[in-house]
């Protein structure tokens, strides 16, 4: 069994000696968590995607009551997204460097690092040789893609669970990061950042920003993009989603990239939306971001001022300037 040599780590993560690893299940105190394909399922049955319920042969009458704040559409969308775009691409490495520019990676060597909302594990993939242990958690079936992408990484523990209901002990992680996740939750994103403090003393969080430092055209286009997102995010048809991501990439993103390339001659490319973020990216990578951008029903944006308001909880706040 994959977790046989990880018993001590699991005891430390859950903060109890009462941990047993049994065939296809993990027992912690009085709680039992199924294990499917090396992924420990922390959620209650009412939060299970259909495929998980079927694998566990659960009947509807045995499922627990609906959980308040549970966003099934977000679970569906991100599970669908990462199964549609499961690959870790070469350009992800450059993105990794941008997201982690505030982190001294050398300091992670003997640390336990937690990736909350890990998706396909694309950031953990570049950390697997830089830390002692990785803990990956996602709310969707993308966690199984992450397991496959890190199949040769024996220092990793995989959980499927709800970020807001973690059964882990306080300060279980030396470093915790959550990239592009909390702004999609149905609860206040900044409050969720505050709630994560108990799990690690050092956090790296990426949230959508309210375009404080962007030119006027960015702010002008955002309301139109939001209207489109609210409409198309309700459509779950896979053919529609595939065609929409292709259309969006070819007829919205790439034209803006081309316009930005032309404006580079005059030093004005920074004023063109999408150019800086997507210039040089592959069509596949752009389509994945179109999916991410337009098929999520919930999108929160925060200002620099509101981020600095987190000083009511944290001793130090550092805001990155690269993204």
Model-derived features with residue positions:
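Conserved class I S-adenosyl-L-methionine
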Residues: 202-234, 240-243
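Amphipathic alpha-helical segments
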Residues: 307-312
């Amino acid at each position: 069994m994959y977790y046989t040599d990880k018993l001590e780590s699991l005891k430390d993560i859950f903060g109890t000696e009462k941990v047993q690893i049994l065939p296809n299940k993990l027992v912690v105190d009085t709680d039992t968590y199924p294990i499917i394909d090396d992924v420990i399922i922390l959620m209650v049955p009412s939060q299970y995607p259909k495929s998980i319920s079927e694998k566990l042969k659960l009947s509807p009458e045995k499922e627990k009551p609906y959980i308040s704040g549970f966003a099934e559409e977000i679970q569906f969308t991100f599970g669908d997204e990462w199964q549609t775009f499961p690959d870790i691409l070469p350009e992800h490495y450059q993105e990794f460097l941008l997201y982690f520019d505030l982190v001294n990676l050398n300091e992670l060597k003997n640390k336990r690092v937690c990736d909350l909302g890990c998706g396909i594990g694309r950031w953990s993939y570049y950390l697997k040789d830089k830390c002692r242990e990785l803990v990956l958690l996602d709310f969707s079936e993308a966690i199984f893609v992450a397991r496959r992408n890190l199949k040769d990484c024996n220092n990793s523990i995989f959980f499927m669970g709800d970020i807001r209901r973690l059964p882990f002990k306080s300060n279980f992680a030396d470093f915790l990061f959550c990239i592009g996740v909390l702004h999609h939750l149905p609860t206040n994103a900044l409050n969720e950042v505050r709630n994560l403090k108990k799990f690690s003393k050092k956090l790296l969080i990426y949230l959508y920003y309210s375009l404080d430092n962007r030119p006027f055209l960015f702010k002008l286009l955002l309301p139109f993009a939001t209207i489109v997102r609210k409409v198309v995010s309700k459509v779950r048809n896979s053919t529609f989603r595939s065609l929409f991501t292709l259309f969006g990439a070819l007829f919205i993103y790439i034209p803006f990239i081309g316009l930005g390339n032309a404006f580079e001659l005059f030093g004005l490319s920074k004023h063109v939306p999408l150019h800086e973020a997507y210039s040089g990216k592959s069509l596949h990578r752009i389509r994945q971001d179109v999916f991410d951008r337009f098929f999520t029903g919930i999108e929160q944006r925060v200002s620099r001022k509101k981020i600095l308001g987190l000083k009511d909880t944290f001793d130090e706040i550092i805001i990155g300037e690269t993204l």
